[in-house]
């Protein structure tokens, strides 16, 4: 299960994440849950520190284009919504795209394979 972490200062991702975690906690003793993994990503509101990243998903130029188009299908991402980056004034989708390319550039500079973009994830561990 992939979900946004709760770093969103507008509270939308936080509420969705809380609902997901509550549901998972209610289901944690189901047999299929032993094979279930929860992975958190960050959208517009920041990036994981490199030493905290547990998984990355590299994207080719074509895959990155598909992601960009998928983001733009959401009305909240294309209009002049109040969800702008407080530092540079970009819309959420622009910041997310920039974050994905910046991570790929960082991995390349570290001597790892080069990709168009990368999404980073940190695993959420279900409490007992």
What is each model feature region?
Residues 1-128:
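Metal-dependent de-N-acetylase/amidase catalytic core
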């Amino acid at each position: 299960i992939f979900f946004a972490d709760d770093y969103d200062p507008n509270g939308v991702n936080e509420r969705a994440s809380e609902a997901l975690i509550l549901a998972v906690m209610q289901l944690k003793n189901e047999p299929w849950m032993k094979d279930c993994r929860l992975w958190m990503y960050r959208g517009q509101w920041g990036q994981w520190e490199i030493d905290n990243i547990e998984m990355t998903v590299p994207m080719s130029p074509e895959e990155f284009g598909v992601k960009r188009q998928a983001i733009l299908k959401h009305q909240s991402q294309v209009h002049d919504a109040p969800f702008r980056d407080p530092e540079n004034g970009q819309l959420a989708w622009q910041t997310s795209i920039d974050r994905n390319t910046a991570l790929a550039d960082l991995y390349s500079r570290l001597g790892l394979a080069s990709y168009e973009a990368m999404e980073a994830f940190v695993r959420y561990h279900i409490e007992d």
